[in-house]
A protein has these predicted regions:
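Short S/T/G/P-rich N-terminal loop/turn motif that feeds into the first structured element of a domain
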Residues: 1-70, 90-99
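Short, compact, well-ordered microdomains
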Residues: 65-67, 72-76, 80-83
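Conserved short beta-strand edge segments in small beta-sheet-based binding/regulatory domains
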Residues: 77-95
């Protein structure tokens, strides 16, 4: 079964930049994708009003997701995302789905 992680951000206006993953995080996503642990990912799905952004990562299993989430780089990125969003009045949510 696949495991999907959604990261959704809502910004107050278009003058505020969304938080985006670093080059290093994208490289880590690519490593997991090359190994088959990530089936696909999209990083920049933007709503028509330009105020909402969705990141979607499809893992091949819950175990692969759990492994990914223990990576120091990913933990640090999650901390940076939380800080950035708080400083810039961006609300965000994490949603998971098992399919």
């Amino acid at each position: 079964m696949s495991y999907i992680r959604y990261i959704k951000q809502t910004r107050p206006n278009t003058a505020v930049a969304f938080f985006s993953p670093s080059v290093e995080v994208i490289a880590k996503l690519d490593v997991y994708k090359a190994s088959g642990k990530i089936e696909s990912y999209t990083l920049d799905t933007i709503s028509t009003n330009q105020l909402n952004k969705e990141i979607k990562i499809v893992f091949n299993s819950l175990d692969s997701f759990d492994e990914f989430m223990t990576e120091e780089l990913i933990i640090a990125s999650a901390t940076k995302r939380g800080e950035y969003c708080a400083e810039n009045f961006i609300s965000y949510s994490l949603e998971d789905d098992l399919i």
